[in-house]
């Protein structure tokens, strides 16, 4: 680790300073974190933030990443994990798409529908749609007209009538208000997504990491994740 070679006491009591590297989903950061960052930097002006947007696996020690904020279920990890909250998801489609293929009211109606295929760097085939029906999660791997691996193109594909998508509600209030997207299958909720903070070790947390971890945990205690 590239920490300054000093006694443990001096290290733990050093003033928070230097570059703090955070790996986080870009839309999530823009919506929830970016508007509040001035507060953090005003309190700790000697910290410089470096935000990296990615959904790939990160070797935090090898790559010098201080903290990772992940959305979704986590694979087994040796990292320290702190749960920040859960994000509500919704199923959406464009009005023109629904006009052409019909509005699904029951899960059985999905047999005549398409989904926008979304795949991540860790999964090279589209992720099925998920619905909760009678307290049980049901998966629907619908046919696709288009497959994407970015959040912005995923939403754009739905707005251009390529199929159903499942996304966090917080990033789509405007499209819903403007009628560019419509919520469907409201009787069958989508499982929520956990939001987690990950870092390498409790014993080797730098002062700048410590204050950011405390700040981000408090931020999400005070701020609902679904607004």
What are these regions (language model features)?
Residues 59-64, 74-192, 221-227:
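C-terminal regulatory
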Residues 17-80:
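Central regulatory/effector-binding core of bacterial HTH transcription factors
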Residues 26, 144, 199-202:
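Short loop or secondary-structure boundary microenvironments that flank
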Residues 40, 49-51, 157, 181, ...:
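Hydrophobic packing within well-folded, soluble alpha/beta domains
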Residues 184-226:
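A late-sequence structural motif
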Residues 21-23, 68, 116, 165, ...:
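Short, well-ordered beta-strand segments
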Residues 1-13:
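Alpha-helical "hinge/linker" immediately C-terminal to small N-terminal DNA-binding modules
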